Amino acid sequence: REEPPACTAACPLHLDMRQACALAAQGNFSRAAGILRKTTPFLHLLAGCCNAPCEKSCVMENLGDGVSMQVIEKACALYGGSGAMNRFMIPKKKKIVALAGEDLFCLGCCWELGKKGYEIHWYTGEKTPQEILTDWGLSKEEAAADLGSLEGFRIKKFPIQSGDGSFRDTCMQEADVLCVSPAFRGETLPETCFVGKGYQEVSWILADAKYVALKADRYLQGADFEDVSEPKTDKSRLFVTMDGVTGSKAVAGVETVTKETAQEEAARCIQCQCLECVKGCVYLQEYKRNPRGAIREIYNNMSIVMGNHMANKMINSCDECGQCKAACPNGFDYPEVCRIARQVMVETEKMPPSAHEFALLDQEFSNREGFLARTQPGYESSAYLFFPGCQAAAVSPETVEKAYKNLSGRLKGGVGLMLGCCGAISDWAGREDLFTSALEKIQREWEKQGKPQVICACPTCRKVLQEHTDLEPKGIWEVLLQLGVERVASGTASIQDACGARQDAQARAQVRKFVEALGCQVQELPMAQELAPCCGYGGLMPYANRELSLKKAAFAAGQSQGRILTYCMACRDQLSKAGADTCHILELAYGVEPPGVPDLSGRRANRLKLKEKLLREIWKEEIPMEEKLEIIYAPGVEAQLDDRMILKSDVQAVLKAYEETQAAAEDEEHGYLITNCRIGNVTFWVKFTVSEKGYVVHGAYSHRMTVE
């Protein structure tokens, strides 16, 4: 995105014609002229004498006429005001630059060195500066206008004749460096001398003057002047889509420029920029960043030793979905930068644990209390192992149950079951240690069951296990297609592609075949396949930036007014929150009515209930139930808990601690008791009253301070 447009890249002076056109299109020729005069003041000269490589390279040239940059330059020269600099604003430098010659190159050097504050001793012939410009075809009025920019500079003129070498000794006695016109290239010159290249085109001559003046300036500052880049043009690497752009003809020529025609011509500029990654990414839109600029900010944030890390939230808010990489013509992998940044900042203790602690505790719960690994009853090992993932068990446990029973009844050799988390949560959080631990646990259980074929119901789980383990998992949609799918639906439906399948075209194709086999006709969304937007769950966005997560969900849901099918349960959950008519393809296949959107406490409860039910009904095992307090929640409190990421189990723990200590403060105004308990790194406070039916909770909040 930060690459120069084609017109700038093709110009030896690298004039910012894109910005000039934007301002001229608004009728603001004064500011447009100011943009151009930052590079060169000779606007009449460019408008009349430049061969305009910018126009030939303009992308509009492919559809009609390129934007006439010379018209814009002429209008800026005519209506952009004087280019004279305030001489009081130019800091004076003590050193003197000698300049020899009587051509356009010397005028360019006068401008470049004069604006830097140097005193210039110009050894020239009989030609006046005005005559130098009129020799290029400018009128006296135009020449005077262009030369107005040199007013206020400290320029002293001395006579010289070409071929007379005596000036060298004279000028070098007074000056600190010598800049010489290409006309003197054949003469013997001192080492402290910089000579022009001898270009013929106007833009190249002025670019050469800029190059020589910069070398002289660096020499006078004692800096390395050998690495100064020579004038050059290049082909722009900026990707510009022409979708929806229609060609047009130039409005007017340079000879007939008016404010109106110039404004109309400038409006033909399409303001070339690459926004491919931003189009479908609410995150980049929200933070108003392009990936390169964001990476600079991330680098600076990581480099801070003492002080506030202001970009932490931006780093943690990326969903790491890979859409921007897929959309980028150059495959720029911004999500990987965010992932590495999180990991490094966690390792160096620059990332506070509060950002992702709740999600990491949820992973710990899935792989501890909610974990289950069993072979099918009657089998000591498994030919297959069903791994539905933590989100499916949390959002739609009935679907997991029906899917397992269906697979175990149709596949031979025994189908094992593993309930747990693949570790993607800890990978997103930058916790490589927890990620490795989760993968090792899965690997061990897989080996215990005889290294069966793993069947995943979650595309992210499948991607993680495929990339980081030896399991070689298959998607459940692929297995069911091979077994045969019953036609249970009709009509059209769109598919929200999962981020976990963004790089897996085969999986996306299989899902579409599966949906068609169910009886639905697939209607592709505007942004689908590898360019599908994230639902807003990836990268733990709901925990780091809930508001942005909801915006992403709304953006994804807004792609269709009809039914949207998902093959990721997190997508189904997020789209449901956004009000979309949506269900998971397995819910559709097994006739499960989508159960709505469970809150954070409900998600954990669903995992436990599923585990208990399967153990009881399939493996005939009973789990001792933990005795719970009778708690009634006042209206609105459950929503408050979910919004503040406080679990009902946390409330249970606080009230159990109260029963042991009887420590509470009384809110006399409302008649509440307020008690607290520290669980892990968080102190929870609960407002409650006691009734005949149990505790009535009227509110809760938390913080990370320790109360002593």
Language-model features and meaning:
Residues 604-605, 609-708:
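Ribonuclease/tRNase effector modules and their secretory precursors
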